[in-house]
Amino acid sequence: MRSSYAGQVSEKLMGQTVTLMGWAHRRRDHGGVIFIDLRDREGLVQIVCDPDRAEMFKTAEGVRNEFCLKIVGLVRARPSGTENANLVSGKVEVLCHELEVLNPSVTPPFQIDDENLSETTRLTHRVLDLRRPQMQKNLMLRYRVSMEVRKFLDANGFIDIETPMLTKSTPEGARDYLVPSRVNDGHFFALPQSPQLFKQLLMVAGFDRYYQITKCFRDEDLRADRQPEFTQIDIETSFLSEEEIRGMFEGMIRTVFRNTIGVDLPGYPVMTYADAMHKYGSDKPDLRVKLQFTELTDVMRDVDFKVFSAPAQSKNGRVVALRVPGGADMSRGEIDGYTEFVKIYGAKGLAWIKVNDVAKGREGMQSPIVKNLHDAAIAEIIARTGVCNGDLIFFGADKAKVVNDAIGALRVKVGHSDFGKKNGLFEDKWAPLWVVDFPMFEHDDEGDRWNAVHHPFTAPKDGHEDYMDTDPGKCIAKAYDMVLNGWELGGGSVRIHKAEVQSKVFSALKIGKEDAQVKFGFLLDALQYGAPPHGGLAFGLDRIVTMMTRAESIRDVIAFPKTQRAQCLLTGAPSLVDEKQLRELHIRLRNAGAAGNA
């Protein structure tokens, strides 16, 4: 039996005989003495193999990297000057008495401590990749986060209840993963995008406080912070106001950060969606970046520069400035690089002005666009931006969405750049906030219809119900997102608990009564049986752990993730299935060669 983890051997065990089991991380032969770094999930310890134990030493000579070993030995102090302050075991070593190879290893395709591996190599050989100390730390932290969440919720009266994985396809924004039913010909289950409706039904059923740490599935285009299957901390509660819900779960996240990584998060400012978009062009602003938009739409309506005046005069247009203190030192090449960057977000280009001497007005400015702006516009730019000598001003002018996306991304990129950090435009800190008062609906110009911004079960703010009949664009939702360092950690809303209001929302979304009954009849029926006021939210566990570890991707905090093409390189999923399986499911492929042989 193992008596201790390798990574936990310390001075406390000095003079004791220990039994350790793990993997040979590294083997070194120094003048007839063999050193083996034994690794397990808790860390490393140095094993010393002396030749005076002939049989053990002979076994040690044959040990290679990644052999699985059992070690019995004496814990002793390392010789002076050989201590390793980076290890828990850094002041001690284990003098080996017995060495058993539990299982040898073929030569690994890479060194476990190699930090320059491609992601393809790492995901193809994920089992070996997971042996790397950083990956083990990431997944151990993930476990501790889950444990702290459960402890907090259990202490606050929440009940862990499972909801179905095979459910009904409902419109929630992304494409569903569909599962054909063998016994119900032509019918399909959907894997849940979230337990949204079931957790609301649990509130109607009277469970009062529910939570679940569960898998959710969305068949959508993938980015660095997305996976087709992801883990959600799902929560719902009855009889609490929006403010009480936010307060409780701000407390939960504070507790989790404090108890897992020793971080005391600062206070959470509350910002409306409208303010966030106005100042930062984003509903999840990174408040570590000290740059804000300056609104210039009204100023540019009468300038003789159509690049600015056309969007300024358009109902859906916007013109903003982004002042970059000290930015006049940027080279033309750097500015051209930012110009190409904003094109990724749909911008046609990037106008700019370098301010050399603000007191001279246009004469103190350097830019190809200055000649197109009248004196009043120049004066207003100077006054509103508060620009100083040596500053640079970027401009965004286009449809409001393009401006928000492009200049919002530019703001973050400049702030995070070496220039931004050198010039104090970025503060390395934890910057949480709540974003509230989201629009309830957004207009789809192509389809000429309104869509729900969050989901169609979000309650409108008091007094906004009538807007659903007259002007859905004015309707504000009781919705809230928790944002940390520019990432949405979680979000939720107060739900609709009255059937007539829910029907009104369906009507605004052009979901007819019959269609609503087919898709959501079970919910509408349940709401008629004294449904309590309720609300909740969901946190992305993958994102929380990614933030804590500062990993580049959520794939670094998931044991067996998918690629950006939704593939598992380890197992080869998704894969072809044989024709017999398809026949049992009453499925025939258009490309008959795509199925395997029966």
From Swiss-Prot:
Keywords: Aminoacyl-tRNA synthetase, ATP-binding, Cytoplasm, Ligase, Nucleotide-binding, Protein biosynthesis. It comes from the Bacteria. SUPFAM superfamilies: Class II aaRS and biotin synthetases, GAD domain-like, Nucleic acid-binding proteins. The keyword 4Fe-4S does not apply. Disulfide bonds: none annotated. ATP binds at R218, D219, E220, Q227, E488, G540, L541, D542, R543. It catalyses: tRNA(Asx) + L-aspartate + ATP = L-aspartyl-tRNA(Asx) + AMP + diphosphate. Residues 196-199 are annotated as: Aspartate. One of its GO terms (cellular component) is cytoplasm. Belongs to the class-II aminoacyl-tRNA synthetase family. Type 1 subfamily. Aspartyl-tRNA synthetase with relaxed tRNA specificity since it is able to aspartylate not only its cognate tRNA(Asp) but also tRNA(Asn). Reaction proceeds in two steps: L-aspartate is first activated by ATP to form Asp-AMP and then transferred to the acceptor end of tRNA(Asp/Asn). NCBIfam families: aspS_bact, PRK00476.1. This is Aspartate--tRNA(Asp/Asn) ligase. It comes from Leptothrix cholodnii (strain ATCC 51168 / LMG 8142 / SP-6).
